[in-house]
Amino acid sequence: MDIERINDHTMKFFITYIDIEDRGFNREEIWYDRERSEELFWEMMDEARDHDDFFIDGPLWIQVQAVDKGIEVLVTKAELSKDGQKLELPIGVDKIIDIPLDEGIESLFQQELVEEVEEQAGTNFNEDGTFGFLIKFNDFEDVISLSHRLIFEDIKDELYSFEDRYYVYVEFDEVLHDEEEIDRILSIVLEYGEESTLTIHRVSEYGKQIVKEHALETIRNNFPAKT
């Protein structure tokens, strides 16, 4: 397994499928068996602690991506705000995004996140300085309503369908969007949908891409707002 320290808050792991099998796991169970995937994860974190003194002292954000020969895992330390109402997540040099912990986005962070590590597969942190959110919608009408509520500028957005649900993937550039703007946009988006527990990689691979780019604009131009 390869371990790379990105910064004080983030570690990157790459583990091959051969290494995974040598540890007594198989490919299927690390994706579909929560207990076994957590067991593998904590093995990896133990090695990170021994390798580079990467200690766990609070909640984590975890991104898992499947590649040809194995999986890549990005682990970022986060902290609760002093009032316990927000999760403070480093997204760059001297930049922190505040995610409110309230009933409106309880699917994004469950209450136990305050006390223990919780995997959030729907959020993706990329090496190019962008990070994305995968939002699930139970009804296409909710996507239409959102498209007439928000107009995106310099934000990548795509629309997918998967297992009778709709998914909008939105991607922000930390250079173009400050944390206050991102907080505002996410709070509106999550009035209509909920943070997905799936990764964008799984939805894009096994689902159907409906709109490749400018998804909300395309929907807004083709579907009238409900009155």
From Swiss-Prot:
**Any one Gene Ontology molecular-function term assigned to this protein's record:** protein-macromolecule adaptor activity
For this protein, the record's Pfam families field holds: MecA
What keyword terms does UniProt attach to this protein? Competence, Sporulation
Instruction: List, in alphabetical order, the GO biological process terms annotated in this UniProt record.
Output: establishment of competence for transformation; negative regulation of establishment of competence for transformation; negative regulation of sporulation resulting in formation of a cellular spore; sporulation resulting in formation of a cellular spore
SUBUNIT field? Homodimer.
What is its biological role? Enables the recognition and targeting of unfolded and aggregated proteins to the ClpC protease or to other proteins involved in proteolysis. Acts negatively in the development of competence by binding ComK and recruiting it to the ClpCP protease. When overexpressed, inhibits sporulation. Also involved in Spx degradation by ClpC.
Quote the entry's note on domains: The N-terminal domain has binding sites for ComK and probably for unfolded/aggregated proteins; the C-terminal domain interacts with ClpC.
Q: Which family does it belong to?
A: Belongs to the MecA family.
Protein name per UniProt = Adapter protein MecA 1
Organism annotation = Bacillus anthracis
